Amino acid sequence: MDYRKIEASDDKRIAEIIRANLERLHLNIPGTAYFDPELEHLSSYYNSDSSKRAYFVALDETGQVAGGVGIAEFDGIESCAELQKLYLDDSVKGKGFGKELMRIAEDWARSAGYRNLYLETHTNLSVALGLYKKMGFCQIEKPCSTPHSAM
């Protein structure tokens, strides 16, 4: 497996992976990443201000994009970045791609000067919840105010 920053040629595939995951879990509803206006062009969004955000993709053994994760400055909490849009193709789940993508995003956030990480998820995403807990995240009483209120 290989990892790199997102490129424009990855946009369509990442959008497909994100939407397929959300559809399968019946989370293709307003307030989720499914309806993010930047979903069709994540590379433009994340690469437009590379000091405050980044998106990394995972490549499978054939070199095809198999998933990704975003990290971006989180407004409202000092020195905080938000882990965003961690989704994998079904063919690579359970193979360590998610854990490695999280490690890459955390390393980027640390090198960019962030001291805290925040993420939002949904209770339907039990595998993701387990990964986040294993990676040291803890549940807070209520989410911060973000556009992804349904997550």
Can you say where each PLM-predicted feature lies in the sequence?
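Residue-level detector of alpha-helical recognition elements and their boundaries
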Residues: 29, 78, 98, 116-120, ...
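Acetyl-CoA-dependent GNAT
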Residues: 5-84, 89-90, 102-104, 108, ...
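Extreme N-terminal starter segment of soluble prokaryotic enzymes
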Residues: 1-3
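Conserved glycine-rich acetyl-CoA-binding loop
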Residues: 64, 86-103, 107-112, 116-117, ...
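C-terminal "cap" of GNAT-fold acetyltransferases
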Residues: 21-24, 115-151
